[in-house]
Amino acid sequence: MTLPLVEARSLSKSFGEGELASQVLKRLSFDINAGERVALVGPSGSGKSTLLAVLGTLLGATSGDLRILGQPMIGLPEAELARFRNRNLGFVFQFHHLLPDFTALENVLFPAAAGKGRETRLMRERARALLVRVGLEDRVDYGARKLSGGQKQRVALARALINRPALVLADEPTGNLDSGPAEQVMNLLGEINAEDGTTFLISTHDAAVAARCTRRMELLDGRLVGQDPAD
């Protein structure tokens, strides 16, 4: 039997202590299987971004159990979490977070070079190939400041894929884009999911984006109030 890519059991996250503590995630239990494209929906303040940060090992859970690729995440030292994150997880945010003084190619290369401590020819070839794949073959050496919003988000997607992650966590990836560029980004996510088997968890307020996913999970006030069954 194949294990789920992500296994969360009674996962909770609180901020603050004592009477000032605020519980943002409340005993969430779910699985995400390899190759799925899952929409994470819910109103603002429901805990979507916090859940993505916990799944991405950027925030530690307060209680519960989290396993990714079968490996327990809770309690791992930060150095181990950083290595795991770099090798196995990709991130796309609503605001692209590109390094403004770097070219498109240099931005895509950054996670790979950071993980290895150096840049290699094979890394550059893969980064260039990813930029071609997302339709930016004529923008490879453009500075990030010169790119449009949609182009920046496609660079961010290529950057998320540079280390061949098993899971990409996308937090409102089309939320800052007009309809045309947003459609381009969602088409690319769908193609990469179908062709490469990369798993995506996509936080969104957009019903059209959620409809492009294979299933959905709904958060309300930090609780999982609905989810389609895992494939």
Swiss-Prot record:
EC number: 7.6.2.-
InterPro entries registered for this protein in UniProt: AAA+_ATPase, ABC_transporter-like_ATP-bd, ABC_transporter-like_CS, ABC_transpr_LolD-like, MacB-like_ATP-bd, P-loop_NTPase
Bilayer disposition of the protein: Peripheral membrane protein
Pfam family, one: ABC_tran
Entry's Gene Ontology molecular function annotations: ATP binding; ATP hydrolysis activity; transmembrane transporter activity
Known partners and oligomeric status: The complex is composed of two ATP-binding proteins (LolD) and two transmembrane proteins (LolC and LolE).
Binding residue positions for ATP: G42, P43, S44, G45, S46, G47, K48, S49
Domain ABC transporter: 6-230
Transmembrane segments: none
Disulphide bridges, residue numbers: none
Protein name: Lipoprotein-releasing system ATP-binding protein LolD 2
Gene transcribed to yield this protein: lolD2
Stated family: Belongs to the ABC transporter superfamily. Lipoprotein translocase (TC 3.A.1.125) family.
Compartments, as annotated in UniProt: Cell inner membrane
PROSITE patterns on file: ABC_TRANSPORTER_1, ABC_TRANSPORTER_2, LOLD
Function: Part of the ABC transporter complex LolCDE involved in the translocation of mature outer membrane-directed lipoproteins, from the inner membrane to the periplasmic chaperone, LolA. Responsible for the formation of the LolA-lipoprotein complex in an ATP-dependent manner.
SMART domains assigned to the protein according to its UniProt record, in alphabetical order: AAA
Lineage: Bacteria, Pseudomonadati, Pseudomonadota, Alphaproteobacteria, Rhodospirillales
